[in-house]
Amino acid sequence: MQYDLLIKNGYAVDYASAREGYFDVAVQNGMIAAVESSIGGSAVRELDASGKLVLPGLVDSHVHASAWLGGSYAHRMLAKAGVTSALDMSGPGTSVLELAREYGTGLNLATIEYVRPGHTVSSDDPSSAELQQLITKVQRQGSLGIKLLGGHYPLTVAATARAIRAAAELGAYTAFHAGTAAHGSNIEGLLEAVELADGNPLHLAHINAYCRGTVLPEAEETELALKALAANPNISCESYLSPLNG
């Protein structure tokens, strides 16, 4: 059989099947066709991956690839890290598209739009109607939903709850850098975010950023965060991989 691509002699890791080892990988019509210890046949293109890892493309659910955050190098950096699909976690969506046209590397890239007083909403206490209008607008423009930038541009507690609820009603994705006018980006802000979600879907960004020991010892804050997540399956999250992070 002739494949489109045959990758030979690499150390392959398949997270879905928990299989890893030295395997050949065959690709046909853009899909993995076979993973075997040795694959015969020919291919339009053959790569020797000796001494290299062969990994599935990474899905990064929190990146920045706009002119506001991330900049023109974002696409190249993601591709070099092995990312194939990503969610830009603030927008503006129009800027993400512009950079993709100019500097794109073939990523599957989705966006959500920031909720920022004086820019996308009128104040730090937008009404439900204003939030619904924003969400509908960005959905029509192609974004999946909204990002609450509580750690940088916090809304009032009530407006934060309204935003999460409005997004849920409109079927929009909501991500939240925890923090409101009442609580900062710490364990208190995290627990407040869980409460404000009120059972609605919510992506709580970089969970470990709120467990740095600013209120309680780090271990206690981490335990509180883990318990809160376990008790609220409506909330998803990711974490920083580096000990030095924003």
Feature roles, as predicted:
Residues 1-41:
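N-terminal metal-binding scaffold of metallo-dependent hydrolase/deaminase domains
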Residues 73-153:
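Divalent-metal coordination cores built from histidine and acidic residues
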Residues 55, 99-112, 164-176:
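Alpha-helix-loop-beta-strand connector modules within alpha/beta enzyme cores
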Residues 14, 62, 90-91, 150, ...:
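Residues that line or immediately flank small-molecule/substrate-binding pockets and catalytic motifs
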Residues 58-68, 150, 174-181:
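Histidine-centered catalytic micro-motifs
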Residues 128-145, 154-246:
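Histidine/acidic residue-rich metal-binding segments in metalloenzymes
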Residues 10, 30, 51, 62, ...:
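Divalent metal-coordination and catalytic microenvironments
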